[in-house]
Amino acid sequence: MKYVVAAASLMLALFVVPISGQSRAGHAESAAASAPQLKFHLDEEFFKLPDNIWPSEAVGVALNSKGHIFLLNRGNHPLLEFAPDGSFIRSIGDGSTIFHAAHSVRFDAEDNMWLVDAGNNVVVKFNSKGRIVQALGRRLEPWVYMTHGIERAIPGPAAFYQPTDTVVGPDGSTYVTDGYGNSRVAKFSREGNLVKYWGDRGSRPGQFNTPHSIVMDRNQNLYVADRQNNRIQVFDTDGKFKQVWDLDGLTWSMCITPGPTQVIFVGSVGKVYKLDLNGKVLGTFGKLGRLPGWFDSIHAIACPDEKTVYIANEFSYRFDKVILDDAERSSR
């Protein structure tokens, strides 16, 4: 109830104007190192921000069905909406204290917007008219216990411990990576009831060390970015482990392209990987830095098609539109 009251200003602003069942994707780590460098350039003037708005930590980016781009940051203007041509539409939630640690923004197939607040331990669903229609988790109420002097989280019904991301399946089931504390994936019904959860902290298949991002393909396979383990794990919708893809860097963020032939882009530190759905690294681009054309910790990534990638650079407070080029253009 407290969350709904606190979120009122945002609500009003939003829309007013295989081995024994296990499989590893070859030697993805070494394959990533030898993968081709993808050529790209930035559309450096794409996002047309007003002079009085400066984003802070860039943590989320997502597109709705109209092609509008939503940028989530931890500043005084937490949610920024842009038209498909990059023109500024509005700033949402200005000056509010609704977020304790804004972490992710996603849209589902029905154009509902899902906002993940790691600090408040909640995931909130807004319908296409901007009304809060569902809240998962309990605001500021993580499940925690101590063992041998170490703080650990107790996975409990409708309780998160610093959740990180979410994806919604075609049946309305919601999957939440839960996250910094619980190291698990939680599945909820369309109605918001906890169905099951899987995973705990570790490095074995099915375990996680900071599950930080999650996406789903057309066949309802779930891909989880297991950040501190430098890998992607693949599950079915019941949590059955299917594959693990090892990479050579932290797996911060993911997006998956629409259409019949899908690819996954994985954001790391200074680098983006492009993978097919078998875990093959098709190419990489980027290098570490804070200048335009370089990237830092890629906290979020969005890919409306295979040639266009939007990137949230957390620590340089910058959002980029990246265009992947044909072979004749030289990369940055």
Role assignments for model-derived ranges:
Residues 6-18:
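Bacterial N-terminal signal peptides
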Residues 1-4:
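Positively charged n-region of N-terminal signal peptides that target proteins for export
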Residues 18, 22-332:
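Eukaryotic scaffold repeat domains enriched in small/polar residues
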